[in-house]
Amino acid sequence: MNWKDVHKNFSNYKLESVGREKEIISNRVTRTGLEFADFFVHKDLKAVVLWGNDEYLYLKQFDEKLVKEKIEKIFQLTPPLVVLSRSFPAKGIILELAKKYDISILSTKESSADLTNYINTFLTEKLSKKEYLHGNLIELFGLGVLLMGKSGLGKSETSIELIKHGHMFIADDAIVCSNVFNKIIGRAPKRFFGFLEVRGLGIINASRVFGIEKVKESTQINVIIELVEFDPKVHTFERLGKDLQYKEILGVKIPYYLIPITPGKKTSDMIEVIVAQLKLMLSGYNSFKEMEEKSMEDDDE
């Protein structure tokens, strides 16, 4: 991971200076406040440096010679990339020193607060530990659904039904999972983005078949639904829905449902009901508890 990867993702940021391709190690931007005050913790910088309004106002109080000295001390730490927000003009001394010390610089019209959020999220996803799972990933009613199960149970066919119902397709077969700020983000490997394999039909391009508006690059995984062949001797299925079951992905617990596949059951409809019910449960509503309360009221009468 170096400045080229950041610029590729944020291609609307202007490349002001092309420098060395030093590896970015940290998933957090640094504002170099301590370094500007001549307090140096590290001998080199391995994080993306972000300068905005605060840094600009700080440097503005000094004469040109002292400003040059302060910036030069930062650049001597060879940061892998410096990003300038809309409040920090990319001109003069900065560009001269960037060329001298072989530092890459990007400038943008974004605010420092937005930049911090965008870049930190991007770096966290790219640098975080990954887990690869087999399944399909669809977004329903704003929630990401990881559909799992053995081959031949109709995951892809179910995904097609859900897309036709207006839901979003993210990935088929291979799901790349990342822990981003304790949220599991799922996406397709780049080379498979937008493609869906259907048994008996082959590979289809979901964006071409269903429309580009039905395909999304990534989503948070909010629920795991596993499809299994119906066998009461092997599996125990939830009947009352009193409590949520969970499975872990990269240390994060995610609501989990085990759904039996039986003749005549339309799986896509079941999944829509599950997601709608889960949204209610996450908002504090529980159908079983309401039924239990009404049963107690009837007993009192």
Swiss-Prot record:
Needed cofactors = Mg(2+)
Q: What class of enzyme is it?
A: transferase
Pfam families named in the record:
Hpr_kinase_C, Hpr_kinase_N
Q: Give the UniProt keywords, A-Z.
A: ATP-binding, Carbohydrate metabolism, Kinase, Magnesium, Metal-binding, Multifunctional enzyme, Nucleotide-binding, Serine/threonine-protein kinase, Transferase
The record lists Mg(2+) as bound by 156, 197
- Looking at the record's lineage, which domain of life comes first? Bacteria
Q: Which reaction does this enzyme catalyse, per its entry? A: [HPr protein]-L-serine + ATP = [HPr protein]-O-phospho-L-serine + ADP + H(+); [HPr protein]-O-phospho-L-serine + phosphate + H(+) = [HPr protein]-L-serine + diphosphate
- Indicate the residues that form the catalytic site: 134, 155, 173 (proton acceptor), 239
What EC number(s) is this enzyme filed under?
A: 2.7.11.-, 2.7.4.-
Give yes or no: UniProt keyword Kinase: yes
Region annotation Important for the catalytic mechanism of dephosphorylation: where it falls in the sequence: 260-265
Reported function: Catalyzes the ATP- as well as the pyrophosphate-dependent phosphorylation of a specific serine residue in HPr, a phosphocarrier protein of the phosphoenolpyruvate-dependent sugar phosphotransferase system (PTS). HprK/P also catalyzes the pyrophosphate-producing, inorganic phosphate-dependent dephosphorylation (phosphorolysis) of seryl-phosphorylated HPr (P-Ser-HPr).
- Subunit and interaction comment: Homohexamer.
Task: Return the domain comment text from this UniProt entry.
Answer: The Walker A ATP-binding motif also binds Pi and PPi.
Kindly provide the name given to this protein in its UniProt entry: HPr kinase/phosphorylase
Organism in which the protein naturally occurs? Malacoplasma penetrans (strain HF-2) (Mycoplasma penetrans)
